[in-house]
Amino acid sequence: MSIDKMSLRKRVENIERISIIPEGTKSEDTKGRIIKENQDDIRTVFMVDRDRIIHSKSFRRLKHKTQVYIKTWGDHYRTRLTHTLEVAQIGKTIGKSIGLNEDLIEAIALGHDIGHVAFAHSGEEVLNELLPNGFKHNINSIRVLTKIEKQGKGLNLTKEVLDGILHHSGFSNKKDITKAFTLEGQVVKYSDKIAYVNHDIDDSIRAGLLHESDLPKDLINVLGRNHSDRIDTLVKDCINKTLENIKLGTIEVGMSEKIEIALKELRKFMFQRVYKGSILKEERDKAKFVLYQVFNYYLKNSNKMPEFYKNIVEQEGLYQGVADYISGMSDDYCLLLFNNIYVPKIVIY
């Protein structure tokens, strides 16, 4: 008997009813999109969201956006794109083990860093200093996905995906810090922490800025002595603690206190030795200088931006239009513009 197209999506939704725990998010129970659409014949709503993000221009640009080390340092360092893929992989592993919606996790993970600026967090710091209302990449990710992509139409993603992206950032468990309303969104937040702390250590060791022996022994004894062991420890702990939470009626993703403290301390070590350390300061300052100059140039010459961003200037103001243009740039494109604007091309007599 042939299976009609409509039943293909229904088959997936039927499987979700069996495989996803009651506390998880089933596709058929979505809170919907800002603009209502007809359902896809084959894919669930979260599969559609995942595919829209993957096929977006903003997603493709992540391959040329720095994670920590600018690509001129070598070919094997993580980019914002490879970081995103690692977050998705870790998140799906955690989600599958708990019994959550893997498609929702994947969509949130793939979109979580869409709003990041060129040159990693140095770029974010520049825009945060220059813009009257500050700048946060998670909020910008939502703006890119809802107001910038598809020439201003946005991708019209589900509320679950947008909420997970908005709340993925931060390293705090304070009660006043809001969290994603789905467990899937909370999984991505933890997966992001697990991924970036560990792969930044791996890249720093590859760059010769750290050695395994430099890592605090008390933390390594808790988390593991190498990259794969640490990820294994953190993933298993997140799964077990979350299942324990659910069993006790606390519907939230988490880690055991011992493991989470160790992860936070390892992140603190990375801030002191790498992210804010003296070794990379010169490179950070160069990146910031480039962004400052390009931003200020377009503040004075907004008429030289593409028409799309000039329209934003007219509708939402000069700073917003320039910020949208700058925040979408890859490292390569930002450097190209800097050279075109400020570096002479011919000898002047």
Curated annotation (Swiss-Prot):
Disulfide bonds: none annotated. The keyword Translocase does not apply. Keywords: Hydrolase. Residues 80-197 form the HD domain. It comes from the Bacteria. Pfam families: HD (PF01966), HD_assoc (PF13286). One of its GO terms (molecular function) is triphosphoric monoester hydrolase activity. PROSITE patterns: HD. InterPro entries: dGTPase, Diverse_Catalytic_Enzymes, dNTPase_2, HD/PDEase_dom, HD_domain, PHydrolase_assoc_dom. PANTHER family: BIS(5'-NUCLEOSYL)-TETRAPHOSPHATASE, SYMMETRICAL, SLR1885 PROTEIN. NCBIfam families: dGTP_triPase (TIGR01353), PRK01286.1-2 (NF002327), PRK01286.1-4 (NF002329). Belongs to the dGTPase family. Type 2 subfamily. This is Deoxyguanosinetriphosphate triphosphohydrolase-like protein.
